[in-house]
Swiss-Prot record:
UniProt organism field: Solibacter usitatus (strain Ellin6076)
Pfam families registered for this protein in UniProt: AA_kinase
The protein, known as: Uridylate kinase
GO molecular function, one term: UMP kinase activity
Keyword Kinase among record annotations: yes
Gene from which the chain derives: pyrH
Length: 235
């Protein structure tokens, strides 16, 4: 069972909210931090992208008449808040962590510089990439894909509420069928909403595998990182 050298972990903003639908649950963040810390302690280099949907969603705001660009910028700032929360939890465990923001805010986070990010990873620091791509109209899934490609990660670890990719939402349809593996093209052609089309296409074009797994099962981040077969592989 071979593990990975470097992973990019994609967490939704909702993952930090715990049982709530909004905000940040400190206990949940600490629990996630412990799992990520265990992976880093095993020698695997870890980059993280956190969404911002527990605080603000630009797309939803645009649907309610707010300017889409303004909404997306607000969503990017929400990811910075989440990134700082996760960073704080990790630092309190003694894990060296760096938050790197695509939007410069020097008092809060380092500016994102690719070579510096790679150097942090090589030194064993966890790097949390904040503020998306800094551009509106791009999701944090796309930001995760971009950062994974830039740092030459071996895989994108997409943590979700379900244990893989299904032909339809298993939380709504008990008869949903799980795919142990699936191609990028089939994800796109079926319109499966595991990640947005831009990020799937980028992974396809660059042959970057995605593993979709259940974040709510304790230990799954480590299992996935060590190469254990869990969830669904998109390749």
């Amino acid at each position: 069972m071979a593990g990975y050298k470097r992973i990019l972990l994609k967490l939704s903003g909702e993952a930090l909210a715990g049982a709530a639908t909004f905000g940040i649950d400190a206990d949940r963040v600490r629990s996630l931090g412990r799992e990520v810390a265990d992976v880093a302690a095993s020698g695997i280099q870890v980059g993280v992208v956190v969404g911002g949907g527990n605080i603000f969603r630009g797309v939803a705001a645009a649907a309610r008449s707010m300017d889409r660009v303004t909404g997306d910028h607000m969503g990017m700032l929400a990811t910075v808040i989440n990134s700082l929360a996760l960073s704080d939890a990790l630092e309190q465990m003694g894990i060296p962590t760096r938050v790197m923001s695509a939007i410069e805010m020097h008092q809060v986070a380092e500016p994102y510089i690719r070579r510096r990010a790679i150097r942090h990873l090589e030194k064993g620091r966890i790097v949390i990439f904040a503020a998306g791509t800094s551009n509106p109209y791009f999701s944090t899934d796309t930001a995760a894909t971009l950062r994974a490609l830039e740092i030459k990660a071996d895989v994108i670890a997409k943590a979700t509420r379900v244990d893989g990719v299904y032909d339809k939402d298993p939380l709504k349809h008990p008869d949903a069928v799980k795919f142990p593996e699936i191609s990028y093209l089939e994800v796109l052609s079926r319109g499966l909403g595991v990640m947005d089309a831009t990020s799937i296409a980028m992974c396809r074009d660059n042959k970057l595998p995605i593993i979709v797994f259940n974040l709510n099962t304790i230990g799954n981040i480590m299992r996935m990182s060590m190469g254990e077969t869990i969830g669904t592989v998109i390749h």
